[in-house]
């Protein structure tokens, strides 16, 4: 039961249920809850006998021409009778989805006037199919369907009807004599069996993404009936080995009205060689993960008038590796509904997930999207918010959007929460990539050897150079903590090889070494933050580095102002809301350079304020004096002055950021989406903190006692090399570098 029950309900109701209701709207009173029933269900007051579809999302309001097109499609659905529906879970596991498909089909049959006994028999015989690669899982799914049938019809076991739920079998070791006996010299049977055997070779490796050629199935089954009473040594082998092959082949070859599944998630690097090669050969444009191949194949298994629904990782919505999959869905299908869950909501998986349903043909219509990314608390909270959105479309996290708009954004991400104004901005503005180079930095291959914190090296070392290496959320300036070995143009890095002679380092972007620009942490779990990058530094792979093609510092400051504004933190997650931001995401941000004329000065001021804050602590390589060293008589007075200084810096930076927000919101026309206000928690210079600052002051005092710092010299007084006693006139450092800690007073 890997997929949560309410998500199973959502998937089935918005695919199989939607298909039926669009052709038979008169059944909605029997199948859908009233407003009162929905409110009671959402509040937790549930009637055990209530089997209505509480997770069904009504279709978004459409333009008149779209409504006319949909009306023609609905006529096709209206011609369907319940016994004509074919539905499948091709990755059925223990049968959770199949069991709820059974319930929904029962409601459909009842609304159509069938008796319960007739409905149960028809569902098992005509409607429901399941496949799984695992034999035990398929047995459990078979059992689930049988128990569900028994729930509705107590005499079902006596009726001799078998579910179409199978474990995928492979033909690798089929008995040739049994095949010859079964075909009995019939050319058509021989051709059919040869094809099935060839196509199901290694089927256990590939599962239900196999494509199987349709055959004359009735002729094959007639032959099985014919040999049932035959007396031949190969009869039992043929029935035991060949019948499952034919059943699985037919199930794979059929086209379905609805496909609903939670496909396996497996990146290419974790696939076995056979599966990896198979997906490369058959799903080359969708090879990043097994789930993407399954989504495409499920579409191919579905009739043009049908629906598919899935529960998958949501990476396909945004990152470039899945752009081909997105384009397939945009151009060949119509996304009807999608729920994007909070990043860690689904604890059973190690990836952020979504669930979605699409119609297997393209119509220029709006779909319904739920954005639940801000609601922490696990899947129960996500369920409650889903029910809230179904009841109240004005909840703030329900959106209606056409996939045709997504192609206006570079990379075509599923940016369903973007406004029409922002889509127009993407279509009419230039992009950052037109004016700036965006690069990932070097990977050393051995950080312990080639990367150090700046305070781990000697003061005048010619081997080490400042290195930008990501870090915590901090805007404008800072996170200057590391140095990299780049002596003689990185000679040691370039000649460091593994046992096979391969260079361990990956030297990306080295043409931009020692170039002024902007840096940001590549991995970020919150808002993005950008900082100025000095011309004496090198970028490492944990950062994205941005360089103005003009090599003009003013252009760096203009873009830094934009990226650190609310525009940057609004648009970048549209392009990629995952924790891993790549250069292409930054290049794709829309920009109008000619309108960024009055922002570089504010950005410069913000960098100065952030540098003052960063350099106030020992962790900065440009630290000069501890800020509590002031010409006052008590620490309390010094702290009060320091507190005033910090507050002024904080308030000035906040005011500057709000002014920049106002400028950019006007440029981008997003007054309805964004406000200029900056929350205190998003201002990344520090306010005074008595406990922290006194502890830090004690640390500085210890540094003075040991000679690392001096009251007479700015910055580091000693970091190795020759000792200069003249630097310590006001306060002498300890001569032997040993200071006992005891109960007696140290100063006499």
Question: PLM ranges: what are they?
Answer:
Residues 89-91, 98, 130, 258-260, ...:
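Structured core elements
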Residues 3-337, 361-368, 373-378, 384-390:
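SAM-dependent methyltransferase catalytic region
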Residues 142-144, 152-256, 331-336, 344-502, ...:
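Polynucleotide-recognition surfaces of large bacterial nucleic-acid defense/processing enzymes
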């Amino acid at each position: 039961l890997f997929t949560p029950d309410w998500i199973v309900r959502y998937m089935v109701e918005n695919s199989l249920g939607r298909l039926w209701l669009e052709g038979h709207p008169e059944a909605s009173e029997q199948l859908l809850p009233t407003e009162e029933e929905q409110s009671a269900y959402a509040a937790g007051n549930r009637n055990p006998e209530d089997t209505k579809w509480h997770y069904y999302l009504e279709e978004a309001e459409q333009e008149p021409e779209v409504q006319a097109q949909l009306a023609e499609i609905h006529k096709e659905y209206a011609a369907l009778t319940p016994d004509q529906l074919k539905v499948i879970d091709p990755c059925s596991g223990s049968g959770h989805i199949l069991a709820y498909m059974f319930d929904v089909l029962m409601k459909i049959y009842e609304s159509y006037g069938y008796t319960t006994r007739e409905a149960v028999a028809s569902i098992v015989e005509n409607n429901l199919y399941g496949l799984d690669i695992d034999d035990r899982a398929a047995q459990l799914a078979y059992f689930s369907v049988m128990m569900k049938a028994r729930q509705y019809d107590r005499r079902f076991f006596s009726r001799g009807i078998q579910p179409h739920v199978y474990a995928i079998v492979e033909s690798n070791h089929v008995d040739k004599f049994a095949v010859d006996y079964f075909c009995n010299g019939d050319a058509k049977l021989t051709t059919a069996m040869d094809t099935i055997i060839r196509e199901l070779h290694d089927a256990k490796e590939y599962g239900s993404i196999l494509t199987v050629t349709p055959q004359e199935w009735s002729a094959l089954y007639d032959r099985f009936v014919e040999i049932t009473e035959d007396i031949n040594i190969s009869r039992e082998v043929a029935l035991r080995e060949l019948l499952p092959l034919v059943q699985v082949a037919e199930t794979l070859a059929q086209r379905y009205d609805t496909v609903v599944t939670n496909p396996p998630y497996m990146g290419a690097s974790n696939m076995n060689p056979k599966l990896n090669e198979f997906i490369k050969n058959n799903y080359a444009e969708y090879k990043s993960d097994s789930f993407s191949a399954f989504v495409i194949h499920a579409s191919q298994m579905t009739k043009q008038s049908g629906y598919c629904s899935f529960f998958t990782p949501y990476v396909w919505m945004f990152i470039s590796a899945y752009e081909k999959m997105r384009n397939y869905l945009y151009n060949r299908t119509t996304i009807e509904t999608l729920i994007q869950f909070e990043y860690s909501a689904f604890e059973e998986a190690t990836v952020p997930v979504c669930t979605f349903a699409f119609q297997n043909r393209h119509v220029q219509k709006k779909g319904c999207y739920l954005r639940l990314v801000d609601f922490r608390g696990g899947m129960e909270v996500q369920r409650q918010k889903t029910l809230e959105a179904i009841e109240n479309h004005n909840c703030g996290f329900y959106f209606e959007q056409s996939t045709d708009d997504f192609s206006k954004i570079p990379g075509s991400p599923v940016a369903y929460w973007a406004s029409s104004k922002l889509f127009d901005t993407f279509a009419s503005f230039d992009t950052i990539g037109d004016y700036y180079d965006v690069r990932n930095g070097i990977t050393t291959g051995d950080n312990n050897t080639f990367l150090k914190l700046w305070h781990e090296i000697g003061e005048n070392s010619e081997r080490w150079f400042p290195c930008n290496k990501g870090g915590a959320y901090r805007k404008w300036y800072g996170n200057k903590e590391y140095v990299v070995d780049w002596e003689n143009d990185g000679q040691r890095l370039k000649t460091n090889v593994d046992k096979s002679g391969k260079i361990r380092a990956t030297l990306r972007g080295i043409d931009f070494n020692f170039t002024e620009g902007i840096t940001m942490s590549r991995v970020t779990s919150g808002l993005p933050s950008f900082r100025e990058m000095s011309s004496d530094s090198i970028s490492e792979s944990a950062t994205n580095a941005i360089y103005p093609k003009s090599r003009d510092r003013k252009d760096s400051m203009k873009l830094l102002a934009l990226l650190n504004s609310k525009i940057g933190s609004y648009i970048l997650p549209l392009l990629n809301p995952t924790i891993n931001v790549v250069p292409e995401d930054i290049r794709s941000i829309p920009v109008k350079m000619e309108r960024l004329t009055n922002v570089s000065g504010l950005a410069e001021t913000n960098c100065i304020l952030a540098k003052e804050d960063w350099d106030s602590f020992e962790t900065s390589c440009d630290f000069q004096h501890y800020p509590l060293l002031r010409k006052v008589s008590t620490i309390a007075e010094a702290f009060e002055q320091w507190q005033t200084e910090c507050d002024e810096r904080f308030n000035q930076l906040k005011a500057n950021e709000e002014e920049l927000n106002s400028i950019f919101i006007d440029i981008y026309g997003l007054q309805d989406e964004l406000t200029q206000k900056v929350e205190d928690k998003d201002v990344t210079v520090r306010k005074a903190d008595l406990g922290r600052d006194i502890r830090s002051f004690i640390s500085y005092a210890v540094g003075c006692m040991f000679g690392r710092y001096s009251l007479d010299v700015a910055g580091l007084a000693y970091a190795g090399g020759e000792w200069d006693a003249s630097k310590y006139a006001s306060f002498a450092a300890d001569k032997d570098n040993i200071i006992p800690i005891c109960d007696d007073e140290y100063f006499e």
